[in-house]
Amino acid sequence: MTKNNETGWNLDNSYTTLPQSFYTEIPPTPVSSPELVKLNHSLAISLGLTPEELKKEAEIAIFAGNALPEGAHPLAQAYAGHQFGHFNMLGDGRALLIGEQITPSGERFDIQLKGSGPTPYSRRGDGRAALGPMLREYIISEAMYALDIPTTRSLAVVTTGEPTYRETKLPGAILTRVASSHIRVGTFQYAAARGSIEDLKSLADYTIKRHYPEIESHENQYTALLQEVIKRQASLIAKWQLVGFIHGVMNTDNITISGETIDYGPCAFMDNYDQGTVFSSIDTQGRYAYGNQPYMAAWDLARLAESLIPILHEDEEEALKIAQDEISKFSVQYEKQWFLGMKKKLGLFSNEEQAHSLIEQLLKMMEKYKADYTNTFRSLTLDAIENTALFESPEFKEWYKLWQSRLDRQEQSKENAYEMMKNNNPSIIPRNHRVEEALEAAVTNDDYSVMEKLLEALSNPYAYSTDQEEYCIPPAPTNRPYRTFCGT
């Protein structure tokens, strides 16, 4: 581990303790004229880095892959994945892990350059990234962080001064992504597919030591690992559902073992409440639709359990039984977390059957009347019932009476109920049309002020500030249907 005292780089490279089949050491491909267009000051400080130093030319060169900080050990990680149900051997095709930053408090975070050039896993890709998708990941990941949803984060975006070719010629960029780690379900699938039990054990042991040290002394630590990942993913997916977030590409290589949201390619936030909502242009069958996300998470975790079977128990039948038993617990854990969250969104403290009924009735009405998901809960939180089709309907008025009666009968005061609602119903989300406006201004006009203003508003989604109201307006019909693209 090497410390650079001026900037604060304090890099370690524990991933290289794994068998070399898990990665390929390769330097980033330099770019012609890098320019820093966005730096995350608060994240930099939390990592032990000095923002003013990071703005200097020598540090911008690091974000661009033209130079490396002391102690860096760039590598591309190997992994596999079920992509829309089809298994492939994959790997970092346009990203490099340059090291693991050890923070002043002793935490460890991967520092990854995304768009840093081709690797042995690029599969005919150019290894580069376009500015628009990198800024989009910055905006959405930081919005997720502010919403208190576990996520990878974005430290910096630099333009490369070079074009990137997709359907059209686009400005190139590199994103510096920060994550608890980049170990995925697909990493375990990769180890299992190669057939080496020793490699699989090495990966599991490393993962436990890094993310779940509390289970190292467990009688069967590999079963405990599966249990912990299931628990974290159940909590994560519930949090997605509660704010209307649609990931769009829940392939097994995009499911982290740490329980963080990763890969913001074709993601978006739901406007009108609809279980079938899909934004991704490549998800033509609706595999990863909003209502399918809990089921797809369970499916992905079943692939993790399959990969762990060789080390869950020496008897294969017993190992299979363990895997099945643990996976069956996901739905119960997810439902528990989701129900708890929905109760908070409606100011309900009790666990009784009427709470279930109130939640189900409201969601059915919201879907029937195509009500805006975020704004419906925002209006209920403010007790400001507006002139919408939902709120004007006779069935909602009846529901509202029942809900108010339930709030009146609780031991806790109504003030406490509304305060809980305020803390669990964001007044603002990264509305898709607002994100596109910010990206258009930045990419086309080199105007980052729209993005900065949006990021400022998104940084405190539970504030209910009058400054945020312009961002609460749903998209006009001309902005629909909204489509997202992975940007690869």
Swiss-Prot record:
InterPro entries: SelO (IPR003846). It is an enzyme of class 2 (transferase). Mg(2+) binds at residues 254, 263. Pfam families: SelO. Its EC number is 2.7.7.-, 2.7.7.108. Disulfide bonds: none annotated. ATP binds at residues 91, 93-94, 114, 126-127, 177, 184, 263. It comes from the Bacteria. GO terms for molecular function: AMPylase activity; ATP binding; magnesium ion binding. Its cofactor is Mg(2+); Mn(2+). It catalyses: L-seryl-[protein] + ATP = 3-O-(5'-adenylyl)-L-seryl-[protein] + diphosphate; L-threonyl-[protein] + ATP = 3-O-(5'-adenylyl)-L-threonyl-[protein] + diphosphate; L-tyrosyl-[protein] + ATP = O-(5'-adenylyl)-L-tyrosyl-[protein] + diphosphate; L-histidyl-[protein] + UTP = N(tele)-(5'-uridylyl)-L-histidyl-[protein] + diphosphate. Keywords: ATP-binding, Magnesium, Manganese, Metal-binding, Nucleotide-binding, Nucleotidyltransferase, Transferase. The active site is at residue 253. Belongs to the SELO family. NCBIfam families: PRK00029.1 (NF000658). Nucleotidyltransferase involved in the post-translational modification of proteins. It can catalyze the addition of adenosine monophosphate (AMP) or uridine monophosphate (UMP) to a protein, resulting in modifications known as AMPylation and UMPylation. This is Protein nucleotidyltransferase YdiU. It comes from Bacillus cereus (strain B4264). The gene is ydiU.
